[in-house]
Design a protein with these regions (language model features):
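Fe-S-dependent hydro-lyases/dehydratases of central metabolism
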Residues: 1-468
Length: 468
């Protein structure tokens, strides 16, 4: 009989240890990524119970969330940040876990480090105490964000108890127009399906648009699956995947790589694969997209007006009014021209070398608008090194951007890079929740790195296509 299982179900079945009472499955986790924020309590649980790390060779630690991106001298000025750093250093030393520390050129944002080191591979199960672990699904792995108690479970047993989600195939046909990026694609999908649209599902992204994407673009898409409510998102491995992994430090070598590549490609969902749901979007219709509200589904194309309140259900209107009020915007207002105070290029969503190249192409020969603070924060030390080798740092600095060290930076309010008061930030990150970027009244507009660069130069939301 022909195997019609999609990739998700193949990988799930391969890693299933046993069925648990209550319907969950105990899954073996092939790669466990940890960082300084969600791991200390997990290691404390191990110490309290006299447990060890079951497979330290399947665990990688890095530091990213709380580290400053300007002055990185130890001890950090922030006492809590220094405490977290000291804790992960001690925990990794005591339990034999590999750590890419701040003085290691391999350090960076956890979801950028795993792929660039060749640790992330097709067919894996991957977990991390971080919401955006679904990034790794770009390689044809199934990757889950987990909580602290689950981090402890994996450290101790290398397994995780999970309920199997349904699988939805999201096909995007056609071809993206110039000035439309991977970030626009995922924002468009979330806008159409909603922040709860993926609850109970894993998303398989398929179609011509994803086939043409680079691995870095695919990572951007999979990264934000969680923002649409999905448990994870993935793209089937193909030759683009294989070519990206080959030669990376932790990738298989020689004949082992050839065997691995053949197996990776065999995992792809067959053409007649079974899915619980299928949805199709036309990539030709996707515009540069900007969020206007307080969740990632509240977005519009650059040439659209903000929605009219009457277009929402009665139940939804209260939340929309709240978003308009918080953002100080009005229904039927153009998104184009909304003033910004800060521009942030970086994060696990858009802090890779291709993101910096796209933004630098817009910044070159131009200058940040008066009164705008603009930051470029590479996603890893290796990305930073590559960008500097290409002269991108000089382009950004000449344009008035601050060139920073690697880290999570302004994506979240756990380090010194924060908004102040009612500042509005054009951001290439992944969440626009109230207070997400540090100020309880700060406002976030999500968009692609190129669109952030365009906004920084104009001093307001603008159409990057007019600068290309």
């Amino acid at each position: 009989m022909t195997d019609r299982r999609n990739l998700f179900n193949k990988v799930w079945d391969l890693h299933s240890v046993r069925s648990l009472a209550g319907g969950q499955t105990q899954l073996f986790i092939g790669l466990h990524l940890i960082h300084e924020v969600t791991s200390p309590q997990a290691f404390s649980i191990l110490r309290d119970r006299g447990l060890t790390v079951k497979y330290p060779e399947r665990t990688l630690a890095t530091v990213d969330h709380i580290i400053p991106t300007d002055v990185q001298l130890r001890p950090f000025v922030d006492g809590l940040a220094e405490e977290m750093m000291s804790a992960i250093e001690k925990n990794c030393r005591d339990f034999g876990v590999r750590l890419f520390n701040i003085d290691d050129k391999r350090q960076g944002v956890v979801h950028i480090v795993g792929p660039e080191q060749g640790l992330t591979q097709p067919g894996m199960t991957i977990a991390c105490g971080d919401s955006h672990t679904s990034t790794h699904g770009a390689f044809g792995s199934i990757a889950f964000g987990i909580g602290t108690s689950q981090v402890a479970d994996i450290l101790a047993t290398q397994t995780l108890a999970l309920s199997r989600p349904k699988v939805r195939r999201i096909e995007v046909t056609g071809k993206l127009r110039p000035g439309v990026y991977a970030k626009d694609v995922i924002l468009h999908i979330i806008r159409k399906l909603g922040v709860q649209g993926g609850v109970g599902y894993a998303y398989e992204y398929a179609g011509e648009v994803f086939d043409r994407m680079t691995m870095e673009e695919r990572m951007t898409v999979c990264n934000m699956s969680i923002e649409g409510g999905a448990r994870c998102g993935y793209i089937n491995p193909d030759q683009t995947t294989v070519d990206y992994i080959q030669g990376r430090p932790f990738a298989p070598q020689g004949a082992d790589f050839a065997r691995a590549a053949a197996w990776w490609l065999s995992l792809a969902s067959p053409k007649d694969a079974e899915f619980d749901d299928q949805i199709t979007f036309d990539g030709n219709l996707i515009e540069p997209t900007v969020t206007w509200g307080i969740n990632p589904a509240q977005s519009v194309g650059i040439n659209e007006l903000l929605p009219a309140l009457a277009t929402f259900t009665t139940d939804d209107q209260k939340g929309v009014r709240d978003a308009f009020e918080y953002m100080d915007l009005k229904e039927q207002q153009p998104i184009r021209g909304v003033k910004i105070d800060v521009a942030f290029i970086g994060s696990c969503t858009n802090g890779r070398i291709s993101d910096l190249r796209e933004a630098a192409a817009i910044a070159k020969g131009r200058h940040v608008a008066t009164g705008v603070k603009a930051l470029v924060v590479p996603g890893s030390q290796l990305v930073r090194e590559q960008a500097m080798a290409e002269g991108l740092d000089k382009i950004f600095e000449a344009a008035g951007f601050q060139w920073r060290e690697a880290g999570c930076s302004m994506c979240l309010a756990m380090n010194p890079d924060k908004l102040k008061g009612r500042e509005v930030c054009a951001s290439s990150s992944n969440r626009n929740f109230k207070g997400r970027q540090g100020s309880p009244t700060g406002r976030t507009l999500l968009m692609s790195p190129a669109m952030v660069a365009a906004a920084a130069i104009a001093g307001c939301v603008s159409d990057v296509r007019e600068l290309n």
